[in-house]
Amino acid sequence: MNGYVPTFRVVINDIRKSIASGQLKEGDKLPSLPELAQQYDCSIGTVRRAIEHLQITGELQGRQGKGTYVTGKLFEGS
């Protein structure tokens, strides 16, 4: 392997690190998808994939028309 990590995985790992370190706390709102895409220099679809993964694991919660929020729960799997 060459050590390549897909961008959506980088986003997932960064958000998880921010939650684990306390930089992001329960109830905190994440930046918008376009803002995150700009931050990671990737497409909105890539960021959406990462956010959806973190919603499935229960670490983030999307609120229609309001944004995406940290649940305070950290997934212990991969």
Kindly give the residue locations of the regions a language model identified.
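A cytosolic small-molecule/anion-sensing beta-strand core signal
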Residues: 64
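Extreme N-terminal segment that seeds HTH/winged-HTH DNA-binding domains in transcriptional regulators
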Residues: 1-44, 49-52, 56-61, 72-78
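Acidic, glycine-anchored pre-beta loop/turn
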Residues: 67-68
